[in-house]
Amino acid sequence: MLEEINYDTKLFGLIGKNIKYTLSPYIHNFSFTTLGINAVYLVFDLDEMKFNRIINGLLEIAEGLNVTIPYKEEVMKYLDNTDTYSTRIQAVNTIYKKGGYNTDYLAIKNLVRKKIGNMSGYECYVYGAGGAAKAAAFALSELGCSSISIVNRTNLRANELVELLNKNGYNASIKENCNSTSNIVVVNSTPNPSVVPENCIQKSELVIEFVYKPVETELIKNAKKYSIKYIDGLEILVNQAVEAEKIWFNKSVSDEKIIEYLYARKLVW
């Protein structure tokens, strides 16, 4: 953490609602110190009324911001521009000087490439239909996933995501649950890791979890139980943060160093 704030200190932060649990300030303030950057990262926990009242002011004074639930889509109308990926996905989680980016998308692409490479021939089941689900669905589609099935509590959001994916030339549909028998990739973008049935995990080649507290959720435990490859929520959180710092500073601390720091501080378990 920066020991002294002065005239030249740059402001960064996270915008969201009910986000006291977040690790983002620990990650970024550690990175700023490690990289020797005169900056501070704060949390802006805003209800909808506060968000609408102060978002323009935050965009004026902050050098860069991250955005989480429930504002990844809403924030776009306040920005001057968005990059190709966030425009297509219609969700932003990283802002730099009023420009929007989606580093959730970049993180999923990076991590899936490391785990299994090309997704050709895989059927992907995405649980949830919010901003994280959009990023995951687009990333997996761009890696070659043959079909995307959206599993969500309500059909309204699921239909919107399916239409968006199909409009961009991908093969998407709504499913009540996974019913394939092989070459499955399962993504949980909801706050509830138990939403994915165990029999679905058993048939998977790769499991992707967005929840990171605890790191070993029920979904990750089951993936380990059946010797399934997995990407946990901490990996996603850290990699998207690293990608955000590359946008802000064109440099970053390594994923491994950040994760080591979080465990050493007992901030994750």
UniProtKB/Swiss-Prot annotation:
Metabolic or biological pathway: Metabolic intermediate biosynthesis; chorismate biosynthesis; chorismate from D-erythrose 4-phosphate and phosphoenolpyruvate: step 4/7
Catalytic residues as annotated in Swiss-Prot or TrEMBL: 72
Positions bound to shikimate: 22-24, 68, 93, 104, 212
Coiled-coil segments: none
One of the record's GO molecular function terms: shikimate 3-dehydrogenase (NADP+) activity
Disulfide pairings: none
Top EC class of this enzyme: oxidoreductase
One record GO biological process: chorismate biosynthetic process
InterPro entries (UniProt xref): Aminoacid_DH-like_N_sf, NAD(P)-bd_dom_sf, Shikimate_DH-bd_N, Shikimate_DH_fam, Shikm_DH/Glu-tRNA_Rdtase
EC code(s) of this entry: 1.1.1.25
Pfam families tied to this protein: Shikimate_DH, Shikimate_dh_N
Catalyzed reactions per annotation: shikimate + NADP(+) = 3-dehydroshikimate + NADPH + H(+)
Keywords for the protein's UniProt record, in alphabetical order: Amino-acid biosynthesis, Aromatic amino acid biosynthesis, NADP, Oxidoreductase
Annotated binding of NADP(+), by residue: 128-132, 152-157, 210, 233
Keyword Transmembrane helix: no
Family matches, as Gene3D superfamilies: Leucine Dehydrogenase, chain A, domain 1, NAD(P)-binding Rossmann-like Domain
CDD domains in the cross-refs: NAD_bind_Shikimate_DH
Subunit structure: Homodimer.
Role description: Involved in the biosynthesis of the chorismate, which leads to the biosynthesis of aromatic amino acids. Catalyzes the reversible NADPH linked reduction of 3-dehydroshikimate (DHSA) to yield shikimate (SA).
Similarity comment: family membership: Belongs to the shikimate dehydrogenase family.
Annotated protein name in UniProt: Shikimate dehydrogenase (NADP(+))
Species name: Saccharolobus islandicus (strain Y.N.15.51 / Yellowstone #2) (Sulfolobus islandicus)
Source species taxonomy: Archaea, Thermoproteota, Thermoprotei, Sulfolobales, Sulfolobaceae
